């Protein structure tokens, strides 16, 4: 007797189509309506209005963040200033390279300094070489080679204010001068030939400036009478104070604190004053020069 095997009918049920075909047909039969020109213009107008409202706020927030970062960096340089003096028997770092005993314009050759018999150079006690190692940063002398100079101007470098804008000609490797958007108070050493940390601390450290926002070429000024030449040098004071943060700038003081100040509270702006564009004297909240006993 022959046994008949059951077979499964694999034929497609009548009236059913594959899912993909069904969807395709539905899409062909369906109706869709795009945006009309008027609706599109309305959307664009709304987005433009939102941009006008948001962009100024975002820009202000960014500038505020840069100001806070600059303040933090200046405060760190103040700490490094103290650490260096403590490690060197109270002797403070110099604000500029001055081979003749007077503040001069610092070029890359002076950053490198003159060789000494022990294999070092005589520029290692200038603040831009002496203090960076205190913060695990690279001394400026390491940027003196032509191939490395462009890296010096990177505003991520702690030696610069992150909001600084350097003139284009300064960014050429052949430009002979490093520009500093932060500077050490140029009046400290000029107060006397051997100013020490103890002398500063014995005076009025809470008002004595150590570091400041330094004016660069092309940046806004507190007053037109401020200096216009030799800007961006590593030593500066009121006449080169840079108000790049909302009409003001940052200062770091000898007691370790730092703060933002309006430009007119740092620079003399009274017309007719012989000090216009320079420091405010007698000093109120800000002292540049040390009073020796």
Go through each PLM region and give its residues.
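Regular, well-ordered alpha-helical segments
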Residues: 52, 60-63, 67, 79, ...
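N-terminal cationic amphipathic segment used for targeting or macromolecule association
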Residues: 9, 20-24, 43, 181, ...
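N-terminal single-pass transmembrane signal-anchor helix
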Residues: 31-62
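Short, well-structured segments within or immediately adjacent to enzyme catalytic domains
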Residues: 71-293
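Short, contiguous strand/loop micro-motifs
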Residues: 34, 67-68
């Amino acid at each position: 007797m022959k046994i008949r095997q059951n077979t499964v009918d694999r034929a497609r049920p009548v009236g059913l189509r594959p899912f993909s075909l069904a969807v395709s047909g539905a899409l062909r039969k369906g109706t869709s309506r795009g945006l009309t020109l008027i609706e599109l213009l309305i959307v664009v107008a709304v987005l433009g209005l939102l941009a006008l409202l948001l962009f100024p706020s975002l820009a202000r927030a960014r500038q505020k963040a840069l100001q806070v970062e600059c303040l933090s960096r200046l405060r760190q340089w103040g700490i490094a200033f103290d650490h260096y003096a403590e490690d060197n028997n109270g002797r403070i770092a110099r604000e500029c390279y001055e081979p003749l005993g007077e503040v001069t314009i610092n070029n890359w050759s002076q950053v490198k300094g003159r060789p000494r018999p022990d294999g070092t150079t005589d520029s290692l006690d200038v603040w831009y070489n002496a203090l960076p190692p205190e913060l695990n940063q690279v001394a400026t002398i390491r940027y003196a080679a032509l191939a490395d100079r462009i890296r010096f101007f990177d505003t991520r470098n702690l030696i610069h204010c992150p909001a600084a804008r350097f003139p284009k000609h300064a960014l050429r490797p052949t430009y002979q001068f490093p520009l500093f958007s932060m500077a050490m108070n140029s009046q400290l050493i000029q107060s006397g030939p051997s100013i020490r940390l103890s002398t500063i601390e014995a005076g009025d450290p809470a008002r004595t400036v150590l570091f400041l926002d330094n004016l660069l070429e092309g940046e806004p000024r507190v007053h037109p009478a401020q200096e216009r030449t030799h800007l961006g040098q590593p030593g500066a004071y009121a006449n080169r104070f840079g108000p790049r943060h909302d009409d003001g700038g940052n200062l770091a003081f000898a007691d370790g604190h730092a703060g933002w100040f309006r430009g007119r509270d740092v620079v003399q702006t009274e017309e007719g004053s012989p000090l216009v564009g320079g420091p405010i004297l007698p000093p109120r909240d800000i002292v540049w020069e040390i009073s020796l006993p």
